[in-house]
Amino acid sequence: MIARDAHEGQFRSSGEPYITHPVAVASIIAQLHLDHEAVMAALLHDVIEDTPYTEEQLKEEFGASVAEIVDGVSKLDKLKFRTRQEAQVENFRKMILAMTRDIRVVLIKLADRTHNMRTLGSLRPDKRRRIAKETLEIYCPLAHRLGIEHIKNELEDLSFQAMHPHRYEVLKKLVDVARSNRQDLIERISQEIKVRLENSGIFARVWGREKHLYKIYQKMRIKDQEFHSIMDIYAFRVIVKNVDDCYRVLGQMHNLYKPRPGRVKDYIAVPKANGYQSLQTSMIGPKGVPVEVHIHTEDMEQVAEMGITAHWVYKENGKNDSTTAQIRVQRWLQSLVEIQQSVGNSFEFIENVKSEFFPKEIYVFTPKGRIVELPMGATAVDFAYAVHSDVGNTCVGVTVEHKPYPLSKALESGQTVNIITDPNAHPEVAWLNFVVTARAKTRIRHYLKQRCEEDAVKLGEVELNVALQPHNLGDFSIQQIRTVLDALALSSLDELLREIGLGNQSASMIAHQFVGVPLESANTKNLEFESKILTIAPMQVGKTQFAQCCHPILGDPIVGCCTEKNTVVVHHQHCASLKNACRQSLAKWDNVQSAVNFEAELQIEILNEQNALLSLMTAISASESSLQNIWTEELENNLLLVILQVCVKDIKHLANIVHRIKGITGVVNVKRNINEL
């Protein structure tokens, strides 16, 4: 077996033979009912990256299709970048574009991530949290957009467990207890539904369904719902043979239990963006408990669980028609291709795609009755571009329900929208302040790119001022602007604004520059330096380095620790690492006016509110420092833990930064991390 032999002698971090991983990934792909080529590619997905096998060899052995899938997966894993942010953005872009060429590449990546999350326990806690956070931000929305709900739910629960293990265990125990207490009532309601449908001549399968742990946690955290109010909702699925029976069941449910007004949703007539279809109703059941029922056909149920992968099931059964999920995903993929062709860089691509990725939809109508699906918050201009690019480009006004309506006002589900056009009209720069769909943004930008330089500069200024909020360009000095221009190798502010307006620079990234975040890390670590800035006695010193565990800075009490290679590592006097055996000597600073820059690490607890991080960045910039790295973690009581690595000249400079940070509203605690004993 090629995969087994190729990975011979390789082991996972858990100590298991590496081959167990591709076998598990292939098993997940098989459970998704994909074709044999996808299963083969899953078994081989790490062969090109981790072994001497080449794409050409795989092509000869298994065919071009399998080799291309494996190569596509491998290329996603091989990308190397200067920063983690850059890596995440570019990897995401590559994955999305790979998906537009062959959806199986990303399905294998989803399966790969699923097994990695299942076996996360052997990694360090900080690495588990980082991988779990990335999974929640990228892979869970992706699985949802493709309609693969059981994968999305599992990834969410595994990520929740990795990021908040204690909360996970507490909530799991609560759910287990609640489930046992609910069992009798669940069986009673289920039996009442079955009897009612049998008496009505409707053949159906009925079972109770429960929310997974992460969804319960999110409802408690974000919507501030109490645990018992979430668990008191009794939810059931009813599966029938055809669409007519779905509506018959709905009628019987409303005869059995009292329906709650305005709580019926028809996703059969208007499916969700990922192809999901069902009838949903909320009623008042026995003893006054809330009862939710989701009604599906067998095909709808399969699409609800399998999403786009249900397409392969139907093909194997001899049906060639695409499912609703498949058709909608194909349209979505085509829209992603259009976005990629219109944007200037990876950051802009991701900013545009995010709005398309996990949307809450509204449904509006054209005057002829065609349904147009848009994300929540979409405006008439978004609607115009959804109908056709030419309609958007020549839009001058709109009527909603035959009445004038502002172009910038958000639409609501059920409205009939009529766009007024003028062949001499053109898109306005101001539209970019309120449109929400990627299609509208990219089409407007595409048109504006063809306009004169002056308009591009105006567009760039609008976008940058929006990104800088609550600041604007006028708040920054000529010297601050010059610093940003020099970092970007640009000669003037107009040139910078034009680059933003043309989409060649990201407004959000430039905004970070203005509040102290550089595109290129400055040379502030200075791991090696000339020993003339300090004295270390009585040692003979070769190379001298600053310890990265405690980050000593000019003015600190310091100790030299000599390594076997005659290199002296300078530590803070109170660093815990000094308890390890090494030849030590007191050291002192010689040159107080040293031009060497130092790196200090601060640990900050701040209220988790809008613009909290921006306030910190502004304080650092105002202190004539720059940010080298940042990590964040959510704490209890709506607090955010922020760890900053900043560039400083000496302890006085650091004290000034700390003083400014302590003056920020919402800051609870600030301390320096010196790895203290």
From Swiss-Prot:
What EC class does the entry list? hydrolase
Q: Which GO terms describe its molecular function?
A: GTP diphosphokinase activity; guanosine-3',5'-bis(diphosphate) 3'-diphosphatase activity
Q: Which domain of life is it from?
A: Bacteria
Pfam families membership: ACT_4, HD_4, RelA_AH_RIS, RelA_SpoT, TGS
Pathway assigned to this chain's UniProt record = Purine metabolism; ppGpp biosynthesis; ppGpp from GDP: step 1/1
Per UniProt, which keywords does this protein have? Hydrolase, Manganese
Q: What chemistry does it catalyse, as a reaction equation?
A: guanosine 3',5'-bis(diphosphate) + H2O = GDP + diphosphate + H(+)
Q: Which residues form the HD domain?
A: 18-117
GO process terms (BP): guanosine tetraphosphate biosynthetic process; guanosine tetraphosphate metabolic process; response to starvation
What cofactor does this chain's UniProt record say it requires? Mn(2+)
Which SMART domains does the record cross-reference, listed alphabetically? HDc, RelA_SpoT
**Annotated PROSITE patterns:** ACT, HD, TGS
The record's EC number reads 3.1.7.2
ACT domain ranges (all copies): 601-675
Alphabetical list of CDD domains matching this protein: ACT_RelA-SpoT (cd04876), HDc (cd00077), NT_Rel-Spo_like (cd05399), TGS_RSH (cd01668)
Which ranges carry the TGS domain? Answer: 360-421
Q: Which InterPro entries does this entry report, sorted A to Z?
A: ACT_dom, Beta-grasp_dom_sf, HD/PDEase_dom, HD_domain, NT_sf, RelA/Spo_fam, RelA/SpoT_AH_RIS, RelA_SpoT
Transmembrane annotation, as ranges: none
Protein purpose: In eubacteria ppGpp (guanosine 3'-diphosphate 5'-diphosphate) is a mediator of the stringent response that coordinates a variety of cellular activities in response to changes in nutritional abundance. This enzyme catalyzes the degradation of ppGpp into GDP. It may also be capable of catalyzing the synthesis of ppGpp.
PANTHER family in alphabetical order: BIFUNCTIONAL (P)PPGPP SYNTHASE_HYDROLASE SPOT, GUANOSINE-3',5'-BIS DIPHOSPHATE 3'-PYROPHOSPHOHYDROLASE
The entry assigns this protein to a family as follows: Belongs to the RelA/SpoT family.
State what protein this is by name. Guanosine-3',5'-bis(diphosphate) 3'-pyrophosphohydrolase
What species is this protein from? Haemophilus influenzae (strain ATCC 51907 / DSM 11121 / KW20 / Rd)
